[in-house]
Amino acid sequence: MAKHLFTSESVSEGHPDKIADQISDAVLDAILEQDPKARVACETYVKTGMVLVGGEITTNAWVDIEELTRKTVADIGYVSSDMGFDANSCAVLSAIGKQSPDINQGVDRCDPLEQGAGDQGIMFGYATNETDVLMPAPITYAHRLMERQARVRKNGTLPWLRPDAKSQVTFQYDDGKIAGIDAVVLSTQHADTISQKDLQEAVMEEIIKPVLPAEWLSASTKYFINPTGRFVIGGPMGDCGLTGRKIIVDTYGGAARHGGGAFSGKDPSKVDRSAAYAARYVAKNIVAAGLADRCEIQVSYAIGVAEPTSIMIETFGTEKIDQEHLIQLVREFFDLRPYGLIQMLDLIQPIYRQTAAYGHFGREQFPWEKTDKAALLREAAGLK
């Protein structure tokens, strides 16, 4: 492969779509704390002065949707009308029904191992050894820029920052290996008291330089910091936000394929979420085991059916054993039935709010990021 550029973007926790994701997952977590068997599909819409929480939820738990919503928005940092959105005064509307009994009868079984998939669909997982967390570098560093923006905003280092922000990082590759960073874009909402010059200098010194490795930066690296010159109006006042509208930010930044299903607000019986997590777990363990440098796995399901309808592995010519053998190892060491993968990854726990910003993958606190099967896979593959 010759030289090429590849770009990924991330958005902050204060981006309207991410506000919606975090509210949906905060509701999910609160319900799972009380009712592990709950069925949750929670969607959120945010716009100036308003939050609408809807969806299908079947549970014996009781949660205060309004209180959860206000707390989530406040935690993000929207606590003043000066920012265009205020957790204390925004309207919170709720429109929640129950899961269709037609779906439910295909999911629940007397034998939990025969629990059917909550819907048909295709899911992808991916891993690459180009970073220490076995994720593509462009999305990894785009996320880290956004995490840094939130940190210096919340700790007072840059008090004029506001919650809404976006990042974009373009990496240059040479024969598939990272050769450097070609371009960095960072746009951040700010108070109207800061000048463009001061903002650009502060963002460079306090956000970009502490995050991006110096060895990948050069005199030819291009920086675009608030390139429009002004970003005062942001958050839900600037754009409406919806749950599930940042699926590429949530996953691999475009470096791998995506089945189309969003994650936030869905309990683990929804394979859109849980099987995508399991696919990442499989791919990461294959790469951690040294069986391939890059690995993409596709799984598919039929509604109400436990066994996956297909498993496909793509290793882009980097495999150390043939792909049929890889698939045999996946079937041997990973239970990809809905109930099996829920148990394998201990997914019935309130951990989802923290997934809803800065990516679902490449963050070691999540169970699907474990590499506990790597040694077993390597041994079974006969590699020393």
UniProtKB/Swiss-Prot annotation:
Co-factor: note: Binds 2 divalent ions per subunit.
Pfam families: S-AdoMet_synt_C, S-AdoMet_synt_M, S-AdoMet_synt_N
Parts forming coiled coils: none
Cellular component, GO annotation: cytoplasm
Binding-site positions, K(+): 43
CC cofactor: Mg(2+); K(+)
Record: residues binding ATP: 15, 164-166, 230-231, 239, 245-246, 262, 266
Superkingdom in the source lineage: Bacteria
Record-listed L-methionine binding positions: 56, 99, 239, 270
Binding sites annotated in the UniProt record for Mg(2+): 17
Assembly description: Homotetramer; dimer of dimers.
Protein name: S-adenosylmethionine synthase
Species in which this protein is naturally found: Edwardsiella ictaluri (strain 93-146)
Upper lineage: Bacteria, Pseudomonadati, Pseudomonadota, Gammaproteobacteria, Enterobacterales
GN (gene name): metK
